């Protein structure tokens, strides 16, 4: 597994909206990532032909065993890649939740996740925990290929064991204070990656 992080604001053209800058940066990041793996060497600036699963997860038809996933939030774009296992990544900038953390959790989280939030010592800890749980769940659903349609409330997060739905997750160092970054990879807990 390898993670690539870019501040897309640094390449954003005057007047260009955020999504356009992100869309322009994604293939560049993917080409950089592909060049880091030996089985892509010698491709000489290969065009990156991407397709999507019916659920919308991107993949490379020419290298179906190579897995990758993007996430963006705030000023950053993150790419997670794995040459062997399905992978999902989520980045979130900590921002106030308009509807309220508990209200959002009641709508979208498993009851066990909601209980964790209710036990937070104060509003600041509750907000950080909300985004930790959110990124774990979103990374998991992206890893499984379901996306948010898979339901954030389907299974609880086990923070102590760093797993969700039988898969491990890794909370990574974010690109900047005030962000949360999580990766989930599809190898079983009993057999960690090589």
Region roles according to the model:
Residues 1-194:
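Core catalytic alpha/beta fold that binds nucleotide/phospho-ligands
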């Amino acid at each position: 597994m390898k993670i690539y992080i870019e501040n897309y604001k640094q390449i954003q053209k005057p007047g260009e909206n955020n999504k356009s800058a992100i869309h322009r940066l994604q293939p560049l990041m993917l080409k950089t990532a592909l060049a880091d793996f030996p089985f892509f060497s010698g491709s000489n600036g290969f065009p990156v032909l991407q397709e999507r699963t019916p659920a919308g997860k991107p993949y490379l038809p020419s290298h179906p065993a190579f897995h990758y996933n993007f996430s963006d939030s705030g000023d950053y774009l993150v790419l997670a890649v794995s040459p062997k296992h399905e992978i999902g990544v989520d980045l979130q900038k900590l921002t106030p939740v308009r509807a309220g953390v508990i209200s959002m959790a009641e709508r979208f989280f498993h009851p066990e996740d909601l209980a964790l939030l209710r036990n937070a010592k104060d509003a600041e800890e509750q907000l950080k925990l909300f985004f930790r749980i959110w990124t774990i769940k979103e990374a998991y659903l992206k890893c499984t290929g379901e996306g948010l349609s898979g339901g954030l409330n389907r299974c609880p997060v086990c923070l102590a064991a760093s797993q969700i739905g039988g898969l491990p997750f890794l909370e990574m160092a974010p690109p900047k204070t005030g962000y949360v970054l999580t990766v989930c990879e599809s190898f079983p807990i009993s057999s960690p990656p090589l």
